[in-house]
Amino acid sequence: KPMSLSLELPSGSRRFFHGIVARCSQGAGAGQFASYQVTLRPWLWLLTRTSDCRIFQNQKVPDIIKQVFRDLGFSDFEDALSRSYREWEYCVQYRETSFDFVSRLMEQEGIYYWFRHEQKRHILVLSDAYGAHRSPGGYASVPYYPPTLGHRERDHFFDWQMAREVQPGSLTLNDYDFQRPGARLEVRSNIARPHAAADYPLYDYPGEYVQSQDGEQYARNRIEAIQAQHERVRLRGVVRGIGAGHLFRLSGYPRDDQNREYLVVGAEYRVVQELYETGSGGAGSQFESELDCIDAGQAYRPLPTTPLPIVRGPQTAV
């Protein structure tokens, strides 16, 4: 069943966390209250509970994804895609969950998603560019206050960590078209970084395309996915209104180059609710958020982690 939690924001409005109850357990409890644990998941998670073998013909990947959603009874999604996508003559879901199927298609095409939460539903937003994201009301700029300054009434960050990791600087793909055996299909995409060891190349075959322009897009998607891992900033604080998919600008940090606009690609929250039983002790209500961010100017793409299904031998149509 659906369930939502609400959190009061500084403005007096409320932020909602909505999901499907995927698991519920009851413990022994303490005092006069029972103990329950509830796991909420987005409706997309239910696609991990169904599998199929299907063929889609003459459709673009966004249309295939939306058809899979609708066929399973889901309509709470939004198309915020801005790029053009090729038409697939033939696309097969083969002995895999519907979640794995749509995930690997999105990974190949450079599509990702995030969720917008409302009181009675959550909406999956298909995205592929900066224009799909907004700053939530009242959070266009969020200040950094050092922990030594003590408690601040305004939502703020109090901890900052930045990590950079060397990544491959270029990717070359190649493939073969049996209908055009002489066609040159090798493509290359690169993103230069101003540091040592930034130009190591990757090569992969087959690239899963028969037109070089499609290969160029796939190579770009993959190198952007890799380079999105190059620099990550983790910000911890009391910031109640920001979540994955949101934009904000950091202000007040001692390193001025870090006072820039970020895209949130992951969020964790810790909420402690005050206890209702007299004499039970414990702290009052507390909230802490930890946001995983990238520079808003860096394109975000999903890493290709979903395995391709394997067809073992020829398949008869009889």
Predicted feature locations:
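Amphipathic alpha-helical and helix-coil boundary elements used as assembly
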Residues: 1-318
